[in-house]
Amino acid sequence: MCILLHMEKKRFADGVLTTLCYVEKEGKWLMLHRNKKKEDINKGKWIGVGGHFEAGESPEDCLYREVFEETGLHVLSHQLRGIVSFFYGEKDCSYMFLFTAVLEEGPLKECSEGELQYFSYEEVKALPLWEGDRIFLELLTKGEGFFSLTLRYDREGKLLEAILDGKENLLSS
């Protein structure tokens, strides 16, 4: 049994587990402008709320904790919409559980990671986003069912490949 547990720990040894949530309210998405941390891979970009798993957390546990930490509000309902696999260069990777959610009513707290603001779906398209985020946001707004998306970036942040459900490269269509 000890050998099996050791093997299980190594399966994601080269990858990071995260959640990302797009909060919906009155036809708008809650976006976080990552502009407060010096060392931030997302610096200057607008993204949803979320973050890294802590030890022992399920995707939902991570979702609830991260959303509350960043907004000060609790999740009322949520839906797991997809899993996104990110590959950067040859070795670095992360796996993201992508959610949409509705939050309790109340004022948003000040976030230590950046500025929170609601935008219409059309306004979001004009924001500085990662190219891969544009792809999965489009899938979310179209109401696609559950999906798997693989995004490959080079070291400079250029999107090289976007594979939907293991089949279709969205960059070549």
Give the residues covered by each predicted segment.
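Unchanged
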Residues: 53-76, 86-140, 161-173
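Short, positively charged and aromatic/hydrophobic N-terminal segments
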Residues: 3-4
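Short, active-site-adjacent segments that bind or coordinate small-molecule cofactors and metal centers
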Residues: 140-162
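A conserved beta-turn-beta hairpin within the catalytic core of GNAT-like acetyltransferases
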Residues: 39-44, 93-95
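Conserved N-terminal beta-strand and adjoining loop/helix that marks the start
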Residues: 8-31
